[in-house]
Amino acid sequence: MTNIRKSHPLFKIINDSFIDLPTPSSISSWWNFGSLLGVCLATQILTGLFLAMHYTSDTDTAFHSVTHICRDVNYGWILRYLHANGASMFFICLFLHVGRGIYYGSYTFSETWNIGIILLFAVMATAFMGYVLP
């Protein structure tokens, strides 16, 4: 009798993706930070879009729009806090991801490492332009 997770078409996809994933035995929890970066980035984009629907950048009404988001919009307070704390979590994951690369010697792959450094500088410049300057 065959195992259903290896013979059923839907279960076979799940089995190959999660259970019998061909990864080395030396993989550790440090390798999860790339996935966490994707989750944090998706959260930032979604909460940022929803917050931008109610925010006005006019200097006279900006504070009023933030209080409107927190008080009048359904779950607006949680969107604001998710967006603020998600940015911190994104950078924590980003620095841990770079630290993992330094620890495991990924800088020897110069092309991949240089692209990563360019992305790091682009993310830091975007954060500076979007959060520090306004």
From Swiss-Prot:
Heme b b562 binds at residue 83. The keyword Electron transport applies. The chain crosses the membrane at residues 33-53, 77-98, 113-133. Keywords: Electron transport, Heme, Iron, Membrane, Metal-binding, Mitochondrion, Mitochondrion inner membrane, Respiratory chain, Transmembrane, Transmembrane helix, Transport, Ubiquinone. Belongs to the cytochrome b family. The cytochrome bc1 complex contains 11 subunits: 3 respiratory subunits (MT-CYB, CYC1 and UQCRFS1), 2 core proteins (UQCRC1 and UQCRC2) and 6 low-molecular weight proteins (UQCRH/QCR6, UQCRB/QCR7, UQCRQ/QCR8, UQCR10/QCR9, UQCR11/QCR10 and a cleavage product of UQCRFS1). This cytochrome bc1 complex then forms a dimer. Component of the ubiquinol-cytochrome c reductase complex (complex III or cytochrome b-c1 complex) that is part of the mitochondrial respiratory chain. The b-c1 complex mediates electron transfer from ubiquinol to cytochrome c. Contributes to the generation of a proton gradient across the mitochondrial membrane that is then used for ATP synthesis. This is Cytochrome b. It comes from Rhinolophus hipposideros (Lesser horseshoe bat).
